[in-house]
A protein has these predicted regions:
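A short alpha-helical cap/connector motif
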Residues: 1-111
Length: 111
């Protein structure tokens, strides 16, 4: 789980929470992760290859996690633009990461 430390940045104020969630998930052998509201990203963020800490990094962190543990991430957002951005910056984890354009309540009801 060494990968998680690269997300430990002073601007990532949620890092301790994400780290704890990931540790607990690994200890419990969770393989399926469901996210409502994907990381949005910005073109500037991707063009300069800088982390957008204010946008939350959950999609990228969970995508990398499920790639390592051979699990699955299912991420839902109502915005096609947000989904397209998230697909772009998680493409190297696309084998284990799935995106859905949908209202989160509908998505969770039918998941």
């Amino acid at each position: 789980m060494i990968f998680i430390e690269k997300y430990n940045n002073k601007k990532n104020i949620r890092f301790p929470f994400f780290k704890k969630v990931i540790e607990m998930s690994i200890n419990r052998n969770f393989k399926t992760f469901v996210e409502t509201g994907t990381s949005r990203g910005k073109k500037k963020f991707f063009f300069f290859n800088k982390m957008n800490w204010k946008d939350g990094m959950s999609t990228l962190m969970f995508a990398e996690l499920v790639s390592e543990i051979r699990g699955e991430l299912h991420s839902c957002d109502i915005s096609k633009k947000n989904i397209d951005n998230a697909k772009s910056f998680t493409k190297k984890f696309s084998k284990n990461t799935f995106f859905y354009i949908n209202d989160s309540v509908d998505f969770l009801t039918n998941f």
